[in-house]
Amino acid sequence: MNKIMLCLLVCGVVHAATYDLLKAPNYFEDFLHKFNKNYSSESEKLHRFKIFQHNLEEIINKNQNDSTAQYEINKFSDLSKEEAISKYTGLSLPHQTQNFCEVVILDRPPDRGPLEFDWRQFNKVTSVKNQGVCGACWAFATLGSLESQFAIKYNRLINLSEQQFIDCDRVNAGCDGGLLHTAFESAMEMGGVQMESDYPYETANGQCRINPNRFVVGVRSCRRYIVMFEEKLKDLLRAVGPIPVAIDASDIVNYRRGIMRQCANHGLNHAVLLVGYAVENNIPYWILKNTWGTDWGEDGYFRVQQNINACGIRNELVSSAEIY
């Protein structure tokens, strides 16, 4: 990219990220129209405006303090951070675990691999999905990994059924939350996974309607990795395919674009899919696929700086599975 194009891009980002807190009422009216928001009463509307105003102030502060990322008013801007996390994430501890997954310690220094790698460039990542108001990020991230495993093995992209996991996983809690490795274990216990078209997503818990005759993917085994060096995730990503990871989503809610260099690490509450890594302006970063639709972030993806444990990406063991 030449200097003129780079300048235009950067200038465009800065301009798009400029907000004036005094114009909050105008932004709020635009927000209501753009996202078709309706409230039950004037008091509820006032309550939502106050939250919106608080979020706008945070967006302005982030845009001033994080020069490599941009934050914006989006569909979540009338929700408190706590509301957004409770409605649109879903990583939580189940009451029991199966312990089928082998635990592997990755304590050797990272290999000298390529500076950049992205599974999307090999057409091994399915399209971005939208979990909606259902705490099933754990199912989406897990199945996103299995979808990529299938594409790597059979050179074909398929969409697997999150609803099957929501309804039929006896360890995790459907839209009320779950964990990544227990989802792999449940896939082994269920015997396979159906297509999304056979068992469509409903954004709610339902009765299990599993049909073993319609299974298209089975999980033979799973592993949990203790990663001693964050850089080691690169080797693992290249070796096993896209990896579901647990993060703290508190600071990504109003993300628009760019490389996040400041991301909270206070508690893991969301699951996303690590699909690649690269370097931009000497900043190494991870590429992560979210499940909040393509109208969020960079067409549904976001980027965070490497080697600072951004969003707590290294706090939890990462998991992978072998399919058949």
UniProtKB/Swiss-Prot annotation:
Annotated GO MF terms: cysteine-type peptidase activity
Q: Which reaction does it catalyse?
A: Endopeptidase of broad specificity, hydrolyzing substrates of both cathepsin L and cathepsin B
Claim: Nucleotide-binding is one of the keywords in the record = no
Secretion signal: which residues?
A: 1-16
Q: What is its EC number?
A: 3.4.22.50
Report the record's Gene Ontology biological process terms: proteolysis
Active site as annotated: C137, H270, N290
Q: Which UniProt keywords apply?
A: Disulfide bond, Glycoprotein, Hydrolase, Protease, Signal, Thiol protease, Zymogen
Which residues are assigned to the propeptide feature? 17-113
Q: Which residues are glycosylated?
A: N159
Cystine pairs: C134-C175, C168-C208, C263-C311
Keyword rRNA processing in annotation: no
**In what way is this protein post-translationally modified?**
Synthesized as an inactive proenzyme and activated by proteolytic removal of the inhibitory propeptide.
Similarity annotation? Belongs to the peptidase C1 family.
Q: What does this protein do?
A: Cysteine protease that plays an essential role in host liquefaction to facilitate horizontal transmission of the virus. May participate in the degradation of foreign protein expressed by the baculovirus system.
What PANTHER family has UniProt attached to this entry? CYSTEINE PROTEASE FAMILY C1-RELATED
Its protein name is Viral cathepsin
Can you name the source organism? Orgyia pseudotsugata multicapsid polyhedrosis virus
